[in-house]
Amino acid sequence: MLPVVILFFIFSATGEAYGTCWALWGSDAFHWNGLSIGLSLGAFGICQTLAQALLPGPAVKLLGERAAILVGVAGVSLALTVMAFAGQGWMIFAIMPVFALGGIGVPALQSLATRQVDENSQGQFQGVLASAVSLASIVAPLAFSSLYFLTRQQWPGAIWLSVVAVYGLAVPLVLGLRLKTAERAAMS
């Protein structure tokens, strides 16, 4: 159960980096104005919405929850790495579909999480998960904005590699998750 709570914290914390740093980074890296920043965030939101609405079910059915989570982490990590080194703003729009693969990770994790405890403990478990998400929403913006301001003069894209590093912490946790009966049956 603890690995699932930590994963929720990691995924929530990394999600905070976008809202905290995206506009500053776009302005610093590409001299984007408000319209360009808004268009990029809008494209990001549309891709994420479509991915979360259309991909998790088929991905979990095809790959299983653990692999779907890992595909989500891999897609986001690849996109963030491209963003870190991107030399032109159009590259960010081009990578959005890959970025959207991250949209399958959290729904797969949520599905897996509901089977980690019995029915009688669901309320308590959901409360613990909500607390982890709340803690991430407090800690992550402070951490990522501080790191951004330390690195923005030398390399604004460094912030995205720091997010990849945090996602990297999730991989061994995902690999170590115990599969419950439903996923074992689906993989057979």
Across the structure, where does each feature detected by a protein language model lie?
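Multi-pass alpha-helical transporter architecture, strongest
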Residues: 161-188
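Short amphipathic helix-loop junctions that connect adjacent transmembrane helices
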Residues: 20-37
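A late C-terminal transmembrane helix in Major Facilitator Superfamily
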Residues: 122-150
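Structural signature of the two symmetry-related core transmembrane helices
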Residues: 67-82
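Helix-to-loop junctions at the C-terminal end of transmembrane segments
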Residues: 51-65, 148
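A membrane-interface helix-boundary motif in multi-pass transporters
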Residues: 146-167
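Intracellular juxtamembrane helix-capping segments at the cytosolic ends
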Residues: 104-118
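Helix-loop junctions at membrane interfaces in 12-TM secondary transporters
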Residues: 82-96, 105
